[in-house]
Amino acid sequence: MDEAYEQEVVSADEALQRDDFEVAFRHLERAHVLAQRMTGRHTFIHWRMLLAGLHRGDFREAVGQVPRIVASILFSRLWVPRGNSGRARVSAFKSMPVPADLRHLVP
């Protein structure tokens, strides 16, 4: 899982450098699914989503990440909605389908 997570983060960074926000958020969402049970990584992805939202000028996304950052610190090890993308426009309590190519990596 570490390799898959790292690849998603690198791919998100590359897309952000090109200002390709759709691709960047897709990779951040996939990294989020992989990191949900790991407090540090989970929090890092929400931080990156906040920064990406600011860079894009999407203040709803950026502001929506603030409570998710707090929740990731407090609840990552207790409960997370499996497959949730982590985006501000999705309920933080909604379980979502895990992408098929990640299913074998997500507990």
Spell out what each predicted region is.
Residues 1-29, 33-36, 59-107:
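N-terminal alpha-helical interaction modules that lie
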Residues 8, 46-49:
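TPR repeat positional signature
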Residues 42-47, 80-82:
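Alpha-solenoid helical repeat scaffolds
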